[in-house]
Structures are given as structure tokens and as C-alpha cells.
Amino acid sequence: MKATKLIYIGAMCFASASIATSRAESDKSVTAAQVNGTWKTKGGEFKIWALGKQRLQVEFSGVYEYKTPQGPMANEGVGSGAATIENDTAIFKPEGAEEECQITLKFTGGKLVVTQTGICGFGHNVSAEGTYKKVSSKKPKFGSD
């Protein structure tokens, strides 16, 4: 009888720990304070501001630098629009971008991890993809401001 109670109690503790872990893993939501601001990487910058109701105002500017016999050159690209966010991940399609363009913004560990699929029309070799670091939490100035 004593062994049965011990097994039962052990199973209940394991089940409780599993449920708590599952909840912690699935609750990856971020606050406006965590997403708001200016994020930078070597070749690009995102300006992001929470609008409420799971929507973000987003503006991207990127550059691809290269050397030519005439000297250094650069291709530049920009995109702006609204993104929808669920938990820690936002989906952004810049206004006027190709249909297959999709930019995924994942806010994780104090960083912004960006993946890009499709042609987004930023310019030759200009991509939003990369890991960005927050450089300011202030409300950014957007091109439309």
C-alpha cells in the first residue's frame, strides 16, 4: 500500500511539472515595451511601434554594400506597412511588395530575429534577414511622420 501511494504521488508531481512546462513554453507573448523602438544590424534597420489589437507599425531600411573598380557602391531598399503579431512573432508584408514576400519578425531573448521569404523588392541583394539588436526604445520617427 505504501509503495502504491508513493508511485501515485510521484506520477502526480510529474504530471503537474509537465503541465507547468507546457504552459511556460506556449506562453511566448511579448509586451509593447519589448517590441517598440529601433532595431539595427550591420545592413539594416527596423522601426517598430505597437498600435494595439495585435498590430504593429513597421518600417525597414536596408543596404547592400559592395566594391567595384570605380570604388565602393551600395544598393538600398525600404519597406513600410502594418504587421500582425501573435505571441512573440509578427508577420510583415511591406506595402507594394510582391505577393510572395513575407517577413517574419520573432522577438526572442531581447533580440529581433528576421527571416524573409520571396522577393520583397528592396533592391539587388538587399534583404531584411538577420538578427537585430535594439538600439532605442523611444518612439521612432517614421517616414510618414
Put a short name on every predicted segment.
Residues L112:
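Basic, alpha-helical nucleic-acid-binding regions used in initiation and control of genome expression
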